[in-house]
Amino acid sequence: MTKAVNKSNRTNNTNRKTEFWQKLPIHIAILTIAFIWTLPSLGLFISSLRPRGDMLSTGWWTVFWHPLEITQFYLGNYGDVLRSSGMGEAFLNSLTIAVPATVIPIAIATFAAYAFAWMTFPGRQLLFILVVCLLVVPLQTTLIPVLRVYAQLGLAGTFLGVWLAHTAYGLPLGIYLLRNYIGALPKDLIEAAAVDGASHLKIFTKLIVPLSMPAIASFAVFQFLWVWNDLLVALVYLGGTADVAPVTIQLSNLVGSRGQDWYLLTAGAFISMIVPLMVFFGLQRYFVRGILAGSVKS
């Protein structure tokens, strides 16, 4: 009996060692990709903590030659960014833009996704194909035509105009992602609710929305990060004036007309990350589930 147990233990140890060596190349590849992906952010963060003269004379990696030398680190860049004129107002403008530009497309995309998944109407599949095709249309091709329309309607330079623009640009992805998820919900559950006399509105509010929270949260993260980090759309439709300028425009203005204060961008980039990181970590538990379900299920 003892010999059999010892033999089994040796077999298990051998199997574990074999499995370890088989998976070692995969682990090395994953760690290498993670290192390469993280390296630019690490360099940006270290640069944000260095004086301008050091950034001009030496590379950021030189801090590792004397890692315990505290005097080589400098917080003045963050102070300069926070004390710059209009930064507080820019944060409020970014929130004013990002929150409605996230909530509005979520509401519209969820309704549309339910209609594509569970309602029958003429041309449903063709219309959904057209929505998917919009995913590959570059938004840059729409900037000038839409801006001309905005100028005629008086929407240029207003928050409403940029809300509508971000809603239009985000809807194709939202509808595609949510339709795949909602369409994979149990058919028996939807049919049972319909047999009990529930209307489409009641099914949508009582069943679809609660069950689709992972996908909705995933799209919310994508949309919020896109809107918060956007510079081009805000610059075109808002014009860059101080009273409506978001953080991205304010950071670009910090550099100066000739780029002489470029070093402030390192600190400004990390300051602007605070709100998106809070949103991401707040919805993180839904994020992976929503992405996997929306892309794998059919």
Curated annotation (Swiss-Prot):
Part of the ABC transporter complex GgtABCD involved in the uptake of the osmoprotective compounds glucosylglycerol (GG), sucrose and trehalose. Responsible for the translocation of the substrate across the membrane. The complex is composed of two ATP-binding proteins (GgtA), two transmembrane proteins (GgtC and GgtD) and a solute-binding protein (GgtB). PANTHER family: ABC TRANSPORTER PERMEASE PROTEIN MG189-RELATED-RELATED, OSMOPROTECTIVE COMPOUNDS UPTAKE PERMEASE PROTEIN GGTD. PROSITE patterns: ABC_TM1. This is Osmoprotective compounds uptake permease protein GgtD. Induction: Expression is very low in cells grown in basal medium but increases significantly after a salt shock. Disruption phenotype: Inactivation of the gene results in loss of the ability to take up glucosylglycerol and sucrose, as well as to accumulate exogenous trehalose. Insertion causes leakage of glucosylglycerol from the cells into the medium. CDD domains: TM_PBP2. The gene is ggtD. It is found in: Cell membrane. SUPFAM superfamilies: MetI-like.
